[in-house]
Amino acid sequence: MVVPTLLAALLTLAPVGEAAVPAIAATAVIDLVVLGGIWLAMRPGAPDVRSAAELDRFRHAGRPVLVELYSNFCLICMATRQVLKAAATDLGANCQIVRVELPTAGGREIAGAYRILYTPSFLVFDAHGDLVRTIIPDTITPLANGYRVLDETGAFVSRLHRISEEDLVRLVRRAA
């Protein structure tokens, strides 16, 4: 959006030269404001869990828990937000969905405990609080390489090309 607008301004403004500089600068500022607004609207927002102790309270509440480990600067995390909302609607009160921001102190503590390196990653706990599934990006570029689903021992179970509402709901229902 920014580049085409700037390019259009550069190509269509007359006169060219010093007189065009204010118009180009104004266009650049408008583009940055619009882009910033879009980014703010898509950000995943505040985490539900800020420490391992908080996560433990959710884990031992007597129902399955789906944990998303995300980053506010991760574009895939932003896209996954709608998938999580749809999964939450499908699962209703049968499951708790919580989010952990990875680049925080609590997020790093939780990520270290479960060997999470990249976002978005997901942990599925059963109603007893036991980890039953981990969904992690295969590499830092999950759009290209997909995700690995691991069991409670860390053994490979299956591969997902992308995170879908159906996959999340199925994994959580299996944990119930």
Where are the regions that the model predicts?
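The canonical Cys-X-X-Cys-His
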Residues: C74-C77, F122
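Alpha-helical transmembrane signal-anchor/signal-peptide segments
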Residues: P47-D56
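Non-catalytic, surface beta->alpha helical segment in thiol-disulfide oxidoreductase systems
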Residues: Y118, L123-A176
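Typically the conserved alpha-helix immediately C-terminal to a functionally engaged Cys/Sec
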Residues: M78-L91
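A short glycine-leucine-enriched loop at secondary-structure breakpoints
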Residues: A113-L117
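N-terminal targeting signals for export/organelle localization
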Residues: M1-D48
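Thiol-based oxidoreductase modules, predominantly thioredoxin-like and allied folds used
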Residues: L69, G92-R108
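Short active-site neighborhood of thiol/selenol oxidoreductases, capturing the structured segment around
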Residues: H60-F73
